[in-house]
Protein backbone atom coordinates (compact mmCIF):
# COMPACT_ATOMS: atom_id res chain seq x y z
CA UNK A 1 0.00 0.00 0.00
CA UNK A 2 2.88 2.34 0.71
CA UNK A 3 4.24 1.78 -2.79
CA UNK A 4 1.07 3.28 -4.27
CA UNK A 5 1.98 6.57 -2.63
CA UNK A 6 5.07 6.62 -4.87
CA UNK A 7 3.74 4.86 -7.97
CA UNK A 8 0.65 7.01 -8.55
CA UNK A 9 2.55 10.34 -8.75
CA UNK A 10 5.22 8.70 -10.93
CA UNK A 11 2.57 7.35 -13.30
CA UNK A 12 0.79 10.70 -13.45
CA UNK A 13 4.08 12.49 -14.07
CA UNK A 14 5.02 10.15 -16.92
CA UNK A 15 1.55 10.51 -18.42
CA UNK A 16 1.81 14.29 -18.24
CA UNK A 17 5.27 14.17 -19.80
CA UNK A 18 3.91 12.04 -22.64
CA UNK A 19 1.06 14.48 -23.17
CA UNK A 20 3.46 17.44 -23.27
CA UNK A 21 5.67 15.60 -25.79
CA UNK A 22 2.64 14.82 -27.97
CA UNK A 23 1.41 18.41 -27.88
CA UNK A 24 4.91 19.64 -28.75
CA UNK A 25 4.99 17.26 -31.74
CA UNK A 26 1.62 18.57 -32.92
CA UNK A 27 2.72 22.19 -32.56
CA UNK A 28 6.03 21.66 -34.37
CA UNK A 29 4.33 20.07 -37.39
CA UNK A 30 5.45 16.46 -37.00
CA UNK A 31 2.05 15.18 -38.16
CA UNK A 32 1.51 17.56 -41.09
CA UNK A 33 2.52 15.27 -43.98
CA UNK A 34 1.53 11.72 -43.10
CA UNK A 35 1.33 10.49 -46.71
CA UNK A 36 4.53 12.10 -47.97
CA UNK A 37 6.95 9.52 -46.59
CA UNK A 38 5.04 6.62 -48.10
CA UNK A 39 5.09 8.24 -51.53
CA UNK A 40 8.78 9.21 -51.27
CA UNK A 41 9.69 5.55 -50.82
CA UNK A 42 8.12 4.76 -54.20
CA UNK A 43 9.83 7.68 -55.95
CA UNK A 44 12.72 6.46 -58.09
CA UNK A 45 14.56 9.79 -57.96
CA UNK A 46 14.68 10.44 -61.72
CA UNK A 47 13.30 13.95 -61.38
CA UNK A 48 14.61 17.12 -62.96
CA UNK A 49 17.89 18.45 -61.64
CA UNK A 50 19.25 15.04 -60.81
CA UNK A 51 21.81 13.37 -63.02
CA UNK A 52 21.17 9.73 -63.73
CA UNK A 53 24.29 7.71 -64.35
CA UNK A 54 24.47 4.10 -65.40
CA UNK A 55 27.36 1.89 -64.47
From Swiss-Prot:
Assigned GO CC terms: plasma membrane
InterPro entries noted in UniProt: Cyt_oxidase_maturation_cbb3 (IPR004714)
Record localization: Cell membrane
Transmembrane segments: 4-24
Biological processes per GO annotation: nitrogen fixation
Highest taxon of source: Bacteria
Leader sequence segment: none
Chain segments annotated as coiled-coil in the UniProt record: none
Keywords: Cell membrane, Membrane, Nitrogen fixation, Plasmid, Transmembrane, Transmembrane helix
Chain's role: The four proteins FixG, FixH, FixI, and FixS may participate in a membrane-bound complex coupling the FixI cation pump with a redox process catalyzed by FixG.
Name of the featured protein: Nitrogen fixation protein FixS
Provenance organism: Rhizobium meliloti (strain 1021) (Ensifer meliloti)
Amino acid sequence: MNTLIYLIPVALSLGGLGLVAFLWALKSGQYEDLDGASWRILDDGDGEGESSQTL
